[in-house]
């Protein structure tokens, strides 16, 4: 059992949790939810013994084996499969002991170790590791490739597989779907449903949470609130609790007003002074119930487009690719006002390539793309977060689009996206990934597009913002094409699903559950093909061709790999600076008046490191995305 009792956690001067209490029973699967920055990841860091509590206590069995996803993956020469097996630390220890016993020819030790290996099912570990990697999207050929060959997103999948292979009692997962496509999300959901240990899962994907968790811990107002059931059940229970809280608050405010009125009237009258004083004490003793904040903090909608030409966009026999590699071939697509299309397809099939083609970021190799007069594109992709001007605020970004508008109108509009008070005029260099994503969306919505192209728009967004975006998209009058691993968003906002597969883009006859079955069928076919003898693959010429292709791919990707390595070194340096600054800020004596200059310098160091780290991370993400795309294309040829 995990017990948090009167827990207090600070980050510098900011209190994240105060007198927070919660209990998690063995075997429970808990969804940890709350707004960005409320302390969810910090709570996991506490359980991992990376930080200490500032007050209160927490306990869990000392014998428990913990597993979590490492955030760093060095460019190792080790094979992917072996790297994943490293996640089972007991197996690796026994393996080393067995090697040593064999060297010493110690028969008794060998027998004892074999017994321990039998007990942990060690003989199946390679097949279990391969199964995890297949589920996360790796091909058989990739299992023996060195870790250094993979881009950042794929290395995060390796880290996830490493955490899953550990025979853990407690599994801690912080946004595990962020680097996954829909196929891998569906597979991970099945795996976690069958997991036998205790799970604490942070996710902003309600459709991912619902079938997995049986309890929700919601962090808000520096407290932890416990709810039995899945996320959908939590929503209903919380709404009920807040409604009751609001009713209590309103009733209490009537009582407070009555008492205050009495005090104001009779405080100065000698004959009534004693009664007034008793009312004052009563008022002070009353526990003030905070007003319930039921409303979503994000409020925005798409204004009607200025024009809705029909069709908005038309593609005829369009082919697309990179260099001499064709990714999509002979595409036919017609987008009209009201088209609401969700793109499905396996990783590397070409979904993002199609979005770039529609957005004009990628020129077709052949065929024609017809754009209507008056078309206005709204295009969202992760790399666009980089295009924000680091030295400008949200208000300055929006004012550039609307120079004639009153500043108050722009401020009111930005408030609907969570930019209020000083945040409206803060430089974006200090913004988190979620804040940058909200600002890019705000700029898109302002421009009244009639064709929206969204490539994974929910990455970095919390549940409240995802819900606000979903509601706004439902009311959008133009055409929509979206790629997302958020199934709730896909179900709620799209009418038609298109499958990107085998270089084709075609309507998919079915829903997301049917797509899940399609994935399963394709995987079975591929497994059967892998098991069949391949005379050609064993030929000397085939091996020679394979080596040639691998050498060409290494040469093509070498400049990107060097840039990624440079950025990783820079991020490591900035992380060290940030950690140093935050360690200093955690010292309460630093806030003494006589150390004001030191505090200011420390805060400046923290801000500078955060800003530099954010810029580095965005450049790293774009480089990783380019490398990932090149590697995927290389594997498909």
From Swiss-Prot:
List the molecular function annotations (GO) for this entry: ATP binding; ATP hydrolysis activity
Record-linked PROSITE patterns: ABC_TRANSPORTER_1 (PS00211), ABC_TRANSPORTER_2 (PS50893)
Question: What is the organism field in this record?
Answer: Escherichia coli O6:H1 (strain CFT073 / ATCC 700928 / UPEC)
> Which superkingdom?
Bacteria
User: Where are the bilayer-spanning segments?
Assistant: none
Q: Which UniProt keywords apply?
A: ATP-binding, Nucleotide-binding, Repeat
Q: Where is this region: Disordered?
A: 523-559
The entry's family comment says:
Belongs to the ABC transporter superfamily. ABCF family. YheS subfamily.
Per UniProt, the ranges with Basic and acidic residues bias are 542-553
Tell me the protein's name: Probable ATP-binding protein YheS
What is the role of this chain? Genetic data indicate it may be involved in ribosome assembly or function. Ectopic expression exacerbates the cold-sensitive growth phenotype of a bipA deletion.
**Does the keyword Repeat feature in the UniProt annotation?**
yes
Effect upon mutating residue 175 to Q: Causes growth defect at 18 degrees Celsius in bipA deletion strain
According to the entry, every stretch annotated as the ABC transporter domain falls at: 2-246, 313-527
Please give the knockout or disruption phenotype noted for this protein.
No visible growth or ribosome-associated phenotype.
InterPro entries per the UniProt record, alphabetical: AAA+_ATPase, ABC_tran_Xtn, ABC_transporter-like_ATP-bd, ABC_transporter-like_CS, ABCF_EF3_subfamily, P-loop_NTPase
Q: Which residues bind ATP?
A: 34-41, 345-352
Keyword Zinc-finger attributed: no
Q: Which PANTHER family match?
A: ATP-BINDING CASSETTE SUB-FAMILY F MEMBER 1, ATP-BINDING TRANSPORT PROTEIN-RELATED
Range of residues in the leader sequence: none
């Amino acid at each position: 059992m995990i017990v948090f009792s009167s827990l207090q956690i600070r980050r510098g001067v900011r209190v994240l949790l105060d007198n927070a209490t919660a209990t998690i029973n063995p075997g429970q699967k808990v969804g940890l939810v709350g707004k960005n920055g409320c302390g969810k990841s910090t709570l996991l860091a506490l359980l991992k013994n990376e930080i200490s509590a500032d007050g209160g206590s927490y306990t869990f069995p000392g014998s428990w084996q913990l597993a979590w996803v490492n955030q760093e993956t060095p460019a190792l020469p080790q094979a992917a499969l072996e790297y994943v097996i490293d996640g089972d630390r007991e197996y690796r220890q026994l393996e080393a002991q067995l090697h040593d016993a064999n060297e010493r020819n110690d028969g008794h030790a060998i027998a004892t170790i074999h017994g321990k290996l039998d007990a942990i099912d060690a003989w199946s570990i390679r097949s279990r590791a391969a199964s995890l990697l297949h589920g996360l999207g790796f091909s058989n050929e990739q299992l023996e490739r060195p870790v250094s060959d993979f881009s950042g997103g794929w290395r995060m999948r390796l880290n996830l597989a490493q955490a899953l292979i550990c025979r853990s009692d407690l599994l801690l997962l912080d946004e595990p779907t962020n680097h996954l496509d829909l196929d891998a999300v569906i597979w991970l959901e099945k795996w976690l449903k069958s997991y036998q240990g205790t799970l604490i899962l942070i996710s902003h994907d309600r459709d991912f949470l619902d079938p997995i968790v049986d309890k929700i811990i919601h962090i808000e107002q520096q407290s932890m609130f416990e709810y039995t059931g899945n996320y959908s059940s939590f929503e209903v229970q919380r709404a009920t609790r807040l409604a009751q809280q609001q009713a209590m608050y309103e009733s209490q405010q009537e009582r407070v007003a009555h008492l205050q009125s009495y005090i104001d009237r009779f405080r100065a009258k000698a004959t009534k002074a004693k009664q007034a004083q008793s009312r004052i004490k009563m008022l002070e003793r009353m526990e003030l119930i905070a007003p319930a904040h039921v409303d979503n903090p994000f409020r925005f909608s798409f204004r009607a487009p200025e024009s809705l030409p029909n069709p908005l966009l038309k593609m005829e026999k369009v082919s697309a690719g990179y260099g001499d590699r064709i990714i999509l071939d002979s595409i036919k697509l017609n987008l009209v006002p009201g088209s609401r299309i969700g793109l499905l397809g396996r990783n590397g099939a070409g979904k993002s390539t199609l979005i770039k083609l529609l957005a004009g970021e990628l020129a077709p190799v052949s065929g024609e793309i017809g754009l209507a007069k008056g078309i206005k594109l709204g295009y969202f992709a992760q790399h666009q977060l980089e295009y924000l001007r680091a030295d400008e605020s949200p208000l300055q970004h929006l004012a550039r689009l609307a120079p004639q508008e009153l500043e108050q109108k722009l401020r009111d509009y930005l408030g609907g996206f969570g930019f209020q008070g000083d945040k409206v005029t803060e430089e974006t260099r200090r913004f988190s990934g979620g804040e940058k994503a909200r600002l890019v969306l705000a700029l898109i919505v302002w421009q009244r597009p009639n064709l929206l192209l969204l490539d994974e728009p929910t990455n970095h967004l919390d549940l409240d913002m995802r819900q606000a975006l979903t509601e706004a998209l439902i009311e959008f009058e133009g055409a929509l094409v979206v790629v997302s691993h958020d199934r709730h968003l896909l179900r709620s906002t799209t009418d038609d699903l298109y499958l990107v597969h085998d270089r084709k883009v075609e309507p998919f006859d079915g829903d997301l559950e049917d797509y899940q079955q399609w994935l399963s069928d394709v995987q079975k076919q591929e497994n059967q093909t892998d098991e069949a003898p391949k005379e050609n693959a064993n030929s000397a010429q085939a091996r020679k061709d394979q080596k040639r292709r691998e050498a060409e791919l290494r040469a093509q990707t070498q400049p990107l790999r060097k840039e990624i390595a440079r950025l990783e070194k820079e991020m490591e340096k900035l992380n060290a600076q940030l950690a140093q600054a935050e360690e200093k800020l955690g010292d309460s004596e630093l806030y003494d008046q006589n150390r004001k200059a030191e505090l200011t310098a420390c805060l400046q160091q923290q801000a500078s490191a955060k800003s530099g780290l954010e810029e580095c991370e965005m450049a790293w993400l774009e480089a990783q995305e380019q490398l990932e795309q090149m590697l995927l294309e290389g594997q498909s040829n």
